[in-house]
């Protein structure tokens, strides 16, 4: 077998191997066997970077936004290299990536650009999605719902996302769900000028959503799967 690990992760970088299998590391450091540099954001259209595989380097256009997608591309390049793919094949595979429903899928309607990221959520992915939203055109609106399975730190983790949202260059934050009340309150304390809206549940959000959005908005929709925010995406698509 093979082991492929993120060499930029402090804990994973210490792994020496397993049953005599040494890991292949990917990351932004040139100490990794597979590393990236010259990272450029193309806004919501994606990322561009140079990938280094040993003595070979090639530029790739990743058709999904966010710095975290560069790491996914590096991991894919590492696996492809292990299994003997050429750099041309690796590049073509990454550049032909098509997001699936609920996984950072861009939906352009006559009125909005919807960033459909509603399949699941954790604190890290929430923050990453908020970072990407800042590149949107028009008003930047984040429609966020509860994150599940966070254990005893669930309140604190929702507050941390709220603080991050308050520091982001967005226009409206709409928080939905019992735990998201903590997110909304922290965001408002962090940035009193940010328009923060709280809805107790999905049904209430769906009822009032039309009054919160306007033509030209870029709208991020993200929550844990149990929140069923695909209904929010559908509502926006049909406006």
Model-identified regions with their sequence ranges:
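ADP-ribose/adenylate-binding Rossmann-like module
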Residues: 4-6
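Short regulatory helix/loop adjacent to the ATP-binding pocket of P-loop NTPases
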Residues: 12-15
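ATP-dependent carboxylate-amine ligase
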Residues: 17-22, 32, 45, 54-56, ...
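A short, compositionally biased
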Residues: 41-48
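Short beta-strand motif preference
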Residues: 49-51, 60
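Nucleotide/phosphate-binding loop and acidic/charged catalytic motifs
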Residues: 72
């Amino acid at each position: 077998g093979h082991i492929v690990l993120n060499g930029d992760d402090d804990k994973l970088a210490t792994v020496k191997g397993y049953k005599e299998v040494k890991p292949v590391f990917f990351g932004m450091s040139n100490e990794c066997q597979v590393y990236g540099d010259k990272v450029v954001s193309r806004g919501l259209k994606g990322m561009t970077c140079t990938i280094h595989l040993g003595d070979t380097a090639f530029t790739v256009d990743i058709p999904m936004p966010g710095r975290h997608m560069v790491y996914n591309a590096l991991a894919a390049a590492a696996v492809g290299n292990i299994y003997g793919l050429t750099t041309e094949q690796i590049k073509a595979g990454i550049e032909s990536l098509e997001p699936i429903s609920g996984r950072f899928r861009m939906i352009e309607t006559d009125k909005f650009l919807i960033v459909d990221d509603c399949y699941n959520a954790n604190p890290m992915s929430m923050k990453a999605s908020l970072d990407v939203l800042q590149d949107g055109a028009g008003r930047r609106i984040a429609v966020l719902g509860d994150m599940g399975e966070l254990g005893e730190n669930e309140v604190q983790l929702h507050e941390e996302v709220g603080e991050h949202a308050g520091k982001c260059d967005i226009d409206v934050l709409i928080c939905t769900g019992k735990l998201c009340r903590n997110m909304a309150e922290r965001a408002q304390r962090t940035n009193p000028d940010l328009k923060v809206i709280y809805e107790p549940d999905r049904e209430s959000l769906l009822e009032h959503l039309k009054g919160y959005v306007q033509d030209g908005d870029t709208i991020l929709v993200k929550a844990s799967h149990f929140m069923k925010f695909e209904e929010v995406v559908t509502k926006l698509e049909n406006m």
